[in-house]
């Protein structure tokens, strides 16, 4: 069973059985405006809670995605890199950003 957790930074975390999928909320993408660029982390990058993991640039602003837990990146959404507008059109489905295996149970 997967649960979705929302952070105060307007990120969503879909908690799966072995990994957590990270993305931005519809509210966040509305505040950013048209997204033109997304920089995702490299595979196998290790993060600690509070680390900057990704960057989103739009016509209005730039924003960082931070990780609220320790973990290692196991998958990135390559389609999102090529089509950053997915963050505007489908932020909580096809616009997911990356998956992380948490160091500790989340």
Residue ranges and their predicted role:
Residues 1-55, 83-106:
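Acidic, low-complexity mobile loops and tails
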Residues 5, 60, 64:
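ABC ATPase A-loop
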Residues 30, 72-73, 79-80:
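Short, charged/polar surface micro-motifs in flexible loops or helix N-caps
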Residues 46, 64, 70-72:
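Beta-solenoid/beta-rich acyl/carboxylate-transfer cores
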Residues 52, 58-59, 76-78:
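Short, surface-exposed secondary-structure boundary micro-motifs
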Residues 58-61, 69:
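Periplasm/extracytoplasmic soluble domains of Gram-negative envelope assemblies
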Residues 69, 77, 102-104:
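Generic hydrophobic/packing signal
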